[in-house]
């Protein structure tokens, strides 16, 4: 059994991570740290865990050394400070953006690898430290990986994507609370969202270079969870050729599905799936992708990375069912 520690245990991604791991046959959760709620029963904060964990299980104030793997479910910019006090013998999967870009892969004696399984599955188990991708970055990259792999991305890419309120985490912000987001939609970080750095890095890795530009408009949605992304770019191939490229690329990826029908968020909420819909209009390839931002965009993908890291079945603990209605 792999012994697990979690830091940032009171947040939304930690909640989903705990729910996945308590049903994972290969792991044991040893410590869940929350600096905000030390000594408080975990089910007091994560009320959906009542009956799922022992009622006397408390948040800890610090991590213990008797673990094999540490999940860092904390905000951006804090991971390095925490890792200074963590033994190098403990493997790490980090949810923040601190180690996602090449220039940040090295920290002290740790070397991080970018944990997008559909991109780096063959090398993830060679690393002890994984930078979990951003949620928008995941939805967007899964839309274009097959094209970048054979160097087909040559033109500008235009993206619009909308995310649920849980994407911002448990923070006190007037633009993120219920009264603002309910029955509402708003843009933010137009053409300047930091997840695009991950996308550009991946395109350059696969194609060596990319001369086009990426125009990304992110939206805050009036719902709690999920991401739906639609992008388009010019591709000078037939639609049949494009579909064959996607089918071939994703044939061994258990969480990626292509749908000829229109797709919607309820198909993926509570799952580690990404569903893609392709359309081709006047040399423009239009790709819609849907994921659960808390699972495939965060905690589920982290467990998928863990499974690959430890040579478990990739889907272990992740055979989750969508909410549906």
Curated annotation (Swiss-Prot):
InterPro entries in UniProt: AGPR_AS (IPR023013), AGPR_type-1 (IPR000706), NAD(P)-bd_dom_sf (IPR036291), NAGSA_dehydrogenase (IPR050085), Semialdehyde_DH_NAD-bd (IPR000534)
Alphabetically ordered keywords of this record: Amino-acid biosynthesis, Arginine biosynthesis, Cytoplasm, NADP, Oxidoreductase
Record protein name field: N-acetyl-gamma-glutamyl-phosphate reductase
EC annotation from Swiss-Prot or TrEMBL: 1.2.1.38
Pathway participation: Amino-acid biosynthesis; L-arginine biosynthesis; N(2)-acetyl-L-ornithine from L-glutamate: step 3/4
GO molecular function, one term: NADP+ binding
SUPFAM superfamilies recorded: Glyceraldehyde-3-phosphate dehydrogenase-like, C-terminal domain, NAD(P)-binding Rossmann-fold domains
UniProt keyword Transcription regulation present: no
GO biological process: L-arginine biosynthetic process
HAMAP family (UniProt xref): ArgC_type1
């Amino acid at each position: 059994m792999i012994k697990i520690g979690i830091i940032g245990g009171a947040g939304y991604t930690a909640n989903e991570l705990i729910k996945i791991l308590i049903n994972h046959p290969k792991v044991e959760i040893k410590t869940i740290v929350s600096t905000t709620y030390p000594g408080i029963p975990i089910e007091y904060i994560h009320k959906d865990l009542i009956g799922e964990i022992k009622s006397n299980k408390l948040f800890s104030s610090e991590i213990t050394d008797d673990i094999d793997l540490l999940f860092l479910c904390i905000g951006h910019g804090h991971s390095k400070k925490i890792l200074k006090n963590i033994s190098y013998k403990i493997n790490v999967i980090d949810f923040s953006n601190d180690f996602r870009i090449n220039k940040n892969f090295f920290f002290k004696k740790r070397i991080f690898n970018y944990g997008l399984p559909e991109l780096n599955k063959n090398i993830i188990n060679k690393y002890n430290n994984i930078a979990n991708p951003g949620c928008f970055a995941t939805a967007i990259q899964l839309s274009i990986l097959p094209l970048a792999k054979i160097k087909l991305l040559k033109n500008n890419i235009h993206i619009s994507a909308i995310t649920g309120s849980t994407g911002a985490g448990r923070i006190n912000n007037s633009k993120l609370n219920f009264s603002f987001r309910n029955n509402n939609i708003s843009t933010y970080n137009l053409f300047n969202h930091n997840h695009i750095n991950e996308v550009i890095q991946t395109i350059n890795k696969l194609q060596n270079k990319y001369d086009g530009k990426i125009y990304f408009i992110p939206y805050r949605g009036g719902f709690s969870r999920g991401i739906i992304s639609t992008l388009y770019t010019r591709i000078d191939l037939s639609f049949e050729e494009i579909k064959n490229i996607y089918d071939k690329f994703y044939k061994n990826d258990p969480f990626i599905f292509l749908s000829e029908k229109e797709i919607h968020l309820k198909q993926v909420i509570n799952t580690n799936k990404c569903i893609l819909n392709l359309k081709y209009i006047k040399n423009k390839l239009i790709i819609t992708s849907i994921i659960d931002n808390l699972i495939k965009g965060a905690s589920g993908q982290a467990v998928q990375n863990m499974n690959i890291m430890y040579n478990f079945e990739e889907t272990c603990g992740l055979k989750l069912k969508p909410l549906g209605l």
